[in-house]
Amino acid sequence: MKKHGILNSHLAKILADLGHTDKIVIADAGLPVPDGVLKIDLSLKPGLPAFQDTAAVLAEEMAVEKVIAAAEIKASNQENAKFLENLFSEQEIEYLSHEEFKLLTKDAKAVIRTGEFTPYANCILQAGVLF
């Protein structure tokens, strides 16, 4: 049994398989998942796991070079917007309209569905490299 890091075997495999510029999505409970994109559903009940907890764990495990979020998060979910800016203070954060954001999710390797019940609590993490 694994002692450290991500224990979810599906999520651990996706992260291990990522290459430079590959994308994964951290999604709230309501974000639609495009047909053909793998959904890793972590949701247990409203609020669990939270968007912030999930993003923090992924930030520890993944080389992230860029973050993409819906611009609407800044006005409608300031707590999570500030959280993203603090967590990814050394990475570029690009803001798009929510509709543009949803279109980009079709190119993701996976959508990780959380139990988050706040608006626009979604982001796309673009993989970087360690060298």
Swiss-Prot record:
It catalyses: beta-D-ribopyranose = beta-D-ribofuranose. Signal peptide: none annotated. It is an enzyme of class 5 (isomerase). The active site is at H20 (proton donor). The keyword Cytoplasm applies. PANTHER family: D-RIBOSE PYRANASE. Belongs to the RbsD / FucU family. RbsD subfamily. This is D-ribose pyranase. It comes from Bacillus subtilis (strain 168). The lineage of its organism: Bacteria, Bacillati, Bacillota, Bacilli, Bacillales.
